From Swiss-Prot:
It is found in: Plastid, Chloroplast. It comes from Chaetosphaeridium globosum. Keywords: Chloroplast, Plastid, Ribonucleoprotein, Ribosomal protein, RNA-binding, rRNA-binding. This is Small ribosomal subunit protein uS14c. The gene is rps14. The keyword Chloroplast applies. It holds the Pfam family Ribosomal_S14. GO terms for cellular component: chloroplast; small ribosomal subunit.
Amino acid sequence: MAKKSIIHRDKKRENLVKKYQEIRNSIKENIKQAKSLNEKWELQKQLQALPRNSSPTRIHRRCFVTGRPRAVYRDFGLSRHVIREMAHSCLLPGVTKSSW
């Protein structure tokens, strides 16, 4: 299980991304539409002035149950360990053990 502080840090980042999403998108759109290089530089400075954690690339996908950052399946939002345990316990509908 991941430390609670790390899970809390990721939740905080998600909230910052939601808070600054519209501002960030509007600045990026203005950068694309800017014609002069000086105007682009000024807009880029505005973008850099936003908090670092407000960028969506800073968010890390984590397992909902354990908080594990690696081997997380997007379809379930769970790590491979939890998926295996839940599949063996018949808690995931439609998931069957493969055999060939």
